[in-house]
Amino acid sequence: MTLLKSYYELCKPNVVYMMLICAFVGMLLAEESVKSFSYLLVALTGIAFCAASAAAINQVIDRKTDASMTRTDQRPLPQGELSVTHASIFALTIGILGATILFLYVNILTMALTLASLIGYAFIYTVYLKRATPQNIVIGGLAGAAPPLLGWASITNSIDPYALLLVLIIFVWTPPHFWALAIYRKDEYAKESIPMLPVTHGVVFTKLQIVLYLSLIHISEPTRQEAISYAVFCL
């Protein structure tokens, strides 16, 4: 793996791409005058840099745990392709760059929300929640559900109830997604003393929670004019 690719993988690109798609949908659904393509690109770039920074910080903090788990042992830090110092400097640099872009060319609200999401995932979830409670992904999932709100705020410079609805959809979907993975990797999480729900409450209970959370998605279904927007977002 080349050095450039190592830094690229440090950013968890697939996760960042999905976040950008959700942010872009938030932009499209915002009820404001259409912004130029260049503006959208700049806003998405700022969000992308901050998301990549959060992912890199997560890998720096979790490097020892990653090295002992099959799912993550091929990441750049466990493989020794990057030093902790270089990875940390890289994460800090792109985080500052992303925040600066949002501050100068988008708006302060989007910058603040994006930084809150970064801190929520990289520090509150990774450092504390992940190892503190089996509800880690329920609480920490809010940071990962933020992209539609970030995209919406970049267009309207406001927090709209419809944007929060989009956040709610992802927020409710996130725990079942991670719990399904945790069931598959249950033994690895147990070995690292990470209290994922299947480890602390068993597989049967976790499957029940998955069903219950998926059923909650119906609560976030919109009515009337919002139905089309909801369908577009889900697609």
Language-model-derived ranges and their functions:
Residues 217-235:
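Single conserved hydrophobic/aromatic residue that forms the stacking wall/gate
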Residues 61-82, 179-206:
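Cytosolic, membrane-interface loops and tails of multi-pass inner-membrane proteins
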